[in-house]
Amino acid sequence: MIKKLMPASTPSLPLWVSTNATSLSRRVGILTTLALIVVLSCSTKSFAQDQPTIAKDSVQVTAFTLSSYKGDFKIFSWVPRLHLRVNGPIASGSQIYAEFTVPGGGAWKFDCKTQETGAGHWWQPDECGGRDALGEDKGITYTGPVNFTIKMRNELMGGDVTLFTGKFKVAKIHSNETGPNYVNHFVYYVDQDWNLPIGYVFLEPDDVYQWKKPTLSFAFWARTELNGPFEPHLFHGGKEVGKMMYEGEESGKAGCGMNEIEDNPTHGTEPHGQFIWTRMRCSFPNIKAWNQTGEGNQTMFGSLYLLSENPGDYEIKILYKGHLVRSIKFGVDADGKITDNRIATNNKLGNNRVIVPVQVLGDADGQWDKNAWKTDAFYGNPLAGFTGPP
């Protein structure tokens, strides 16, 4: 009998080939069984290891107020609504879905639109849940803590995994309607105060030169109905920087022109505007991280301010209606990059933003819970390594 050592498809399982027919049959049967076990094991591990992640800063849970409760239009009720962003890979056949539970047995379960997405990319459905997905008959009048999970099932691969587990508090306030028929018209909302001390500083590609001359930008939260612009100012070494003047007026003025997220009640409330949380994105057009275009920094209105030429500590001060309402501090390295504190990376946010503490000043936001970020941040998933402002 002659034996030969042959390479196998699974390196950890060397294959001995025998010229004896009986022995050969026995060995092939054993190896086939072992190979099947390995394949199934690898498939299960692959599904678990290659699963997507939920970007924490994208998850927004709101209460969608319904105009009836069990067919009674004199009573309002609510159902959950969810926004999220999923970092790939999302395998073919995957389905993202969410489950919400309340004490006493109330529950909702609904799918989120899902698309196959490669690693290094992300998928963001418009929204999940709400009235359109759940219907008027699924509303409840409960207020208090609610638990939820975001999961992914894949019937092609035979797996079901939990991607995110969270909790939040639902409260209610009376609508702006008056009269005996509206006594039980309560508008429901999710308390989002934990957002206020958490901000983001980042670079964005220039409209023309892209990453050869990126712009300094940031995002922050406010709790108020916006009745005027927020005015950001950047300071370095105690002096304001990035200002250009032309014929007595500022050119390239910094501003907060885009609302990234708006958490608004679905109905009007009294007092009005008290339960509106908004995340705004702001930018400094005259402030660039670096200039690798081969062109100079001089413009017809003045010279661009480069972070790469001015590393160190910076502070963003924000005015609202003439009053100082925010202070955001961050650092810049010698290359002009935002000093990375690794909070965003370690918490798998999946973007290039640096998370920074935001000091809330004044009373423009009304009364809010200054300690909510410690326990309620990202719906019971506080950021590892983050410390709020004093």
Model-derived regions: residue spans:
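Bacterial N-terminal signal peptides that target proteins for export
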Residues: 2-33
